């Protein structure tokens, strides 16, 4: 791997406090670009010799290989961050990406679970009463009730939960911490889970969510658990932990929460990220409209 790429990854790791998952994504994108340049430049990759044309040719190559515009733009973002780093460090004098734009994409609206469907799932008998069943039910409850990311959920330790204050301390992206309140119902579920866990599993590691062997639950296992349970909802097009994060935000806004408050609970750095959920409030707008006396009238002048 190029020494400058290595330096950039260290910068992300130690100065920006990016997660290893994010750093690995940057690494793969930059390695892919390095391989492309080497193929065109007889095995040589010198960042200072990269020009706009080769970046654009890389984009064309990705699209020709059926890489989606969304993925191409993500890769391009990684490359832009890399060259911004090189510019700041004085390794390059010109940024070859300053005039490069990615392919246009249609921004899909977030998938979310309807409140009725979620209630039927969580209050139903689709979970066993053993350790894993109690744990899995709580996982879905916490994702839906708090809006945390799956990495944040598996990263919870017992000491992060204050049952008296009814607050959860969550460590998010770049190690930023935030406090999320929880209700009495969720408190009872968490206490019930810890009782079963401490009785049936050797959980001395300190992690809140663990496997049967007592080790910390991984994001991969959590994803599988959520996907399996959400697949019981036939109308749901996508089944993932992030869908429950979308559902949390949607429910909060539909029930009158302010956008800024939802932003803080989700751990977003800007309102722009949170505003994608405002589309769902159209359901409430329709209800308001249909409360209008003229909206209740059937027919109309020409429909008499």
Regions found by a protein language model. Name each.
Residues 1-304:
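Conserved catalytic core of the tyrosine transesterase superfamily
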């Amino acid at each position: 791997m190029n020494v400058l790429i290595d330096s950039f990854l260290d910068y992300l790791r130690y100065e920006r406090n990016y997660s290893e998952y994010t750093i690995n994504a940057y690494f793969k994108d930059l390695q892919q670009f390095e391989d492309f340049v080497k193929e065109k430049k007889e095995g040589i990759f010198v960042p200072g010799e990269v020009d706009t044309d080769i970046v654009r040719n890389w984009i064309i190559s990705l699209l020709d290989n059926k890489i989606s515009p969304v993925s191409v733009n993500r890769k391009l973002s990684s490359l832009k961050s890399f060259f911004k780093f090189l510019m700041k460090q004085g390794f390059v004098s010109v940024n070859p990406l300053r005039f490069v734009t990615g392919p246009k994409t249609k921004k899909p609206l977030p998938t979310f679970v309807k409140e009725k469907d979620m209630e039927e799932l969580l209050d139903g008998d689709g979970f066993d009463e053993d350790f894993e069943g109690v744990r899995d039910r709580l996982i879905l409850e916490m994702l839906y009730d708090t809006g945390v990311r799956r990495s944040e959920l598996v990263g919870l330790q017992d000491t992060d939960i204050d049952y008296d204050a009814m607050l959860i301390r969550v460590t998010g992206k770049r190690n930023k911490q935030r406090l999320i309140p929880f209700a009495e119902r969720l408190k009872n579920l968490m206490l019930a889970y810890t009782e079963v866990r401490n009785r049936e599993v050797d959980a001395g590691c300190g992690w809140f969510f663990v496997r049967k062997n007592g080790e910390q639950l991984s994001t991969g296992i959590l994803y599988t658990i959520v996907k399996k349970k959400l697949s019981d909802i036939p109308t749901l097009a996508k089944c993932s932990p992030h869908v429950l994060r979308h559902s949390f935000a949607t429910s909060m806004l539909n029930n009158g929460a302010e956008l800024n408050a939802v932003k803080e609970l989700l751990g977003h750095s800007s309102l722009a990220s949170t505003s994608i959920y405002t589309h769902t409030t159209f359901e409430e707008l329709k209800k308001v409209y249909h409360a209008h006396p003229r909206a209740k009238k059937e027919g109309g002048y020409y429909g008499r």
